[in-house]
Amino acid sequence: MANAALIEALRAADAVQFGEFELSHGGTSSYYVDKYLFETDPRCLKLIAEAFAERVADDDKLAGVALGAVPLVAATAVETNKPYVIARKKAKEYGTAKRIEGALDEGEEVVVLEDIATTGQSAVDAVEALREAGAVVDRVVVVVDRQEGAAELLADHDIALESLLTAEDLLADADG
């Protein structure tokens, strides 16, 4: 069953919007889930961190995909008292020039936390970077799965997709 409190919080934060929107992959949609509105809303952030915490195993290290999932993974780290790493899309060209920020040991089991899954490509990229760094990753947990192919793409890379909410959950009974 969908998390009714989280749905209500996302709607109250105006994070679910209706109209014509261009998505990051170039497609268009009649609705938009504004991650910046829910990631900067304390009530949403608390509910998300609590829900993510329920899905994290005792031996999991947390990882967040930069930039969008950083507030989510940080809040979940506080909720679970677990350290986390940040997976960048590409290495910085300055400083340490790393794709993975934070301490990560070879063989550590990592669960990736992400904001929204549409195609799933950013999650796949993060998992590949973590695996290249020696992590064992087989699971991504997202706030919202837009149900537009992410689960299938991730499955092709031996990654399970779990979501707190699906587009179907979020749009049920919506006034759009």
From Swiss-Prot:
Keywords for this protein: Glycosyltransferase, Magnesium, Pyrimidine biosynthesis, Transferase
InterPro entries referenced in this protein's UniProt entry, alphabetically: OPRT, Or_phspho_trans_dom, PRibTrfase_dom, PRTase-like
Record flagged with keyword Secreted: no
EC number(s) reported in the record: 2.4.2.10
Cofactor field: Mg(2+)
Amino acids binding 5-phospho-alpha-D-ribose 1-diphosphate: 88-89, 92, 114-122
A Gene Ontology BP annotation from the UniProt entry: 'de novo' UMP biosynthetic process
Organism superkingdom: Archaea
Gene3D superfamilies membership: 3.40.50.2020
Residues spanning the signal sequence: none
Any one GO molecular-function label of the UniProt entry: orotate phosphoribosyltransferase activity
Pathway recorded for this protein: Pyrimidine metabolism; UMP biosynthesis via de novo pathway; UMP from orotate: step 1/2
Tagged with keyword Repeat: no
Pfam families: Pribosyltran (PF00156)
Disruption phenotype: Auxotroph for uracil and resistant to 5-FOA (5-fluoroorotic acid).
Binding site for orotate: 118, 146
Summary of the function given for this chain in its UniProt record: Catalyzes the transfer of a ribosyl phosphate group from 5-phosphoribose 1-diphosphate to orotate, leading to the formation of orotidine monophosphate (OMP).
Subunit relationships: Homodimer.
PANTHER family: OROTATE PHOSPHORIBOSYLTRANSFERASE, URIDINE 5'-MONOPHOSPHATE SYNTHASE
The family this protein is said to belong to: Belongs to the purine/pyrimidine phosphoribosyltransferase family. PyrE subfamily.
Protein name according to UniProt: Orotate phosphoribosyltransferase
